[in-house]
A protein has these predicted regions:
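Hydrophobic alpha-helix feature that most strongly marks membrane-spanning transmembrane helices
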Residues: 266-270, 279
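Histidine-acidic residue clusters that define the catalytic metal-binding segment
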Residues: 1-5, 144-185, 216-222, 259
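M16 family metallopeptidases and their MPP-like homologs
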Residues: 14-16, 20-53, 59-107, 120, ...
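A common structural junction motif
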Residues: 104-113, 205-213
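Short acidic-hydrophobic surface loop/beta-edge motif
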Residues: 3-8, 230-233
Length: 279
């Protein structure tokens, strides 16, 4: 059975009742990602997501990791350009306790200065590593050519070394206060529970108060950059990366999803026509 509902605080839920395996797969996605980062502060959303993995008010990072492990579960928060997603997998018998940990992570983050310093330094190391990878360099050049160097869309969600250096823990707290709300959250669920059982297990999320939050504003100038060919010289690279593309329609367009399907068939996956021809 496939079902959907909305909790009193505004969080939307979609579920698929599937009892073939004793597992539950779930995710909570918020429409709050890198697009809400302020100019010069790209990386705030990314670091906020990372900090939600670093313990809660009542649990250190080690204690949280141990609590998740004791349930035979996995729960992680990640950030993309457009959204922040908590995803998880657990045994059916442990679903209620897993949801208690999810509530702790989302509603009671630890905001520990020492953990923040570690997370920030790790992010800076990742940025430095990307700067040595031909594929990452090619993607960065491509995005700036397509969207314009001044557009937030041309940035990587994890930011730059300069932007990360400028970010403080207070920036993360402000982002959390201004952008987190069940009104912009969607939960997806697949497992051997009925709709009423899932809603009962989520009753405690009523502690997450609904509020209006900032929404990303991306201009639609419709301007398409003139066609061009760009080369990036990277001596010693063992492979060449070729990126070809242009701007597409907004995702709210009725043509967007059919275009995604066609794109996947033509060349976006290992089962695509392009992959089969080249391989």
């Amino acid at each position: 059975a496939i079902w959907s509902s909305t909790l009193p605080n505004g969080m939307r839920i979609k579920g698929i009742e599937y009892g073939e395996l004793p597992l539950v797969n779930f995710s909570i996605e918020l429409n709050q990602g890198m697009l809400l980062d302020a100019p010069g502060k790209v990386g705030v959303a990314y670091l906020t997501a990372q900090m939600l993995n670093e313990g809660t008010v009542s649990k250190t990072p080690e204690q949280l990791e141990e609590a998740i492990g004791q349930l035979g579960a996995s729960i992680r928060v990640a950030c993309s350009r457009e959204s922040m997603t908590l995803s998880g997998l657990c045994l059916k018998k442990n679903f209620a306790r897993a949801m208690e940990l999810v509530e702790e992570m989302l509603l009671h983050p630890r905001w520990d200065e020492q953990s923040f310093a570690v997370v920030k330094e790790r992010a800076i190391d990742n940025v430095r590593q990307r700067a040595t990878e031909p594929e990452a360099i090619a993607q960065s050049v491509f995005d700036k050519a397509l969207y314009g160097a001044g557009s937030v869309l041309s940035e990587n969600p994890s930011g730059t070394e300069a932007s990360l250096q400028s970010i403080t823990l207070d920036d993360l707290k402000a982002f959390y206060d201004e952008c987190f709300s069940p009104k912009v959250a969607r939960m997806s669920f697949v497992g051997g529970f009925t709709q009423s059982e899932v809603e009962k297990s989520l009753a405690s999320t009523g502690n997450w108060p609904a509020k209006d939050v900032r929404q990303p504003e991306i201009g639609e100038d419709g301007a398409e950059p003139a066609g061009k060919v760009l080369f990036v010289d990277y001596p010693g690279a063992r492979q060449s990366y070729v990126l070809i593309g242009s701007k597409a329609m907004p995702m709210r367009s009725p043509e967007a999803y059919p275009a995604v399907i066609v794109n996947d068939k033509l060349g976006a996956s290992s089962g695509s026509l392009l992959f089969e021809i080249l391989r």
